[in-house]
Amino acid sequence: VYKRQPLYRMKEPVNMTLAAGEHIAVVGRNGAGKSILVDTITGRWPLLMNEVKYDFSPSPSKMAYENIKYIAFRDSYGDSDGNYYYQQRWNAHDLDETPLVRDLLPEATDSGLKKALYELFGIERMLDKHIILLSSGELRKFQLTKTLLSNPRVLIMDNPFIGLDAKTRDLLHTLLGELTKVTHLQVILILSKSDDIPAFITHVIPVEDRVCGKKITLQEYLAVRKPIPERILSEEKEARILNLPYGGDLYHTEHVVDLNKVSIRYGERTILKDLDWTVKSGEKWALSGENGSGKSTLLSLVCADNPQSYACDITLFGRKRGSGESIWEIKKHIGYVSPEMHRAYLKNLPAIDIVASGLHDSVGLYKRPRPEQMAACEWWMDIFGIADLKDRNFLQLSSGEQRLVLLARAFVKDPELLILDEPLHGLDLYNRQLVKDVIETFCRRKDKTMIMVTHYQEELPACITNFLFLKRN
């Protein structure tokens, strides 16, 4: 690949063929080069030598961009134009500036496929929602529907199952499998979580350290796949976390969160209705529910990001909302990561500056940290195994590496309350276990409280003490 972009090229020449009838999973660690391989397949980057040859028969079009569709699930609302801020989803006065779902879906030439997709993903109930109001899982359903309606010859999907509830994941497996049987569609899945490989996949291509491995059958891959250790975090790092000194600005209240008969509406749609919820100091909550059930909306109230909280009976860290406290007085107690946060951080800053922005809860770094604060940033980057990325620009990192940087940002000020909304999105199996280890160790410290959202039961750390399940409608 183009030699003036060394970070965007494979270290060795790529030999790869997608033969008729094949469906491939590309697997590898975060930062291994999986996305670079996709960019090579799609023709995004010019090559140093040779060329990518295409034969899209029986499609009448010969153009790669018409036959190959690539969905990169990056938790974004539309294009990355820099105009999005992560609280925007909760501000009703911004809604008129964003389109409705129905305005963005193309006309379908195959009415049967359209009906199947609409039923599978519940698109009918989304049609009159503003695109910015879609939850992370709903956004994935919209993106999948939009792309599949265009009848691609080759469909490339980057981690398509993350963010989807278990029922929808199973249905998507089935739908893709059926489409590969009754149409000429061929599928390439880019997977960080290699145990997400569906049964219709025929071959696997491992990618490691920007080297494309040999294509092998799924059965061959499953036979040689190595298990991940039950614990990744070293004893030395575990002790460092447990021995962290406590800061002097701790809250002194038994109840961290108190919600009394809280209801949230957007237009005619009720997201939360008469919700009572108390989170006590030291509790570790798992928050779950189907896509679109209101999980992220609930967290936006706790994080002081949702303006509707002022009209509700909500007490955070012992102070009732609307009693004169600033949002920054609330946020200083909270470490937070979410799909919306990831979307807002598509900024070309050094990774360590992204981590440092967590000290002041800003999107971007507007105040240079003190030396001891920068040392804390480097400390947490080392804990998450990304110390070598500190000077790399954020946009040069893979999606999984970006997520690790944002996790370091959430922990950097040693918060009393951790709010982790699908924190393991896009992480490979090794890094998932590492992050789980860090979370469990951190939460063993006195009076540390956590709220975590995930659609994968196995992602929940062993320290979870309480469960809240939200039902849609």
Where are these regions (language model features)?
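Catalytic Walker B motif of ABC-type/P-loop ATPase nucleotide-binding domains
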Residues: 155-159, 418-422
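ABC ATPase nucleotide-binding domain signature region
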Residues: 38-109, 299-363
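The feature captures the beta-strand-to-loop junction immediately N-terminal to the Walker
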Residues: 27-29, 288-290
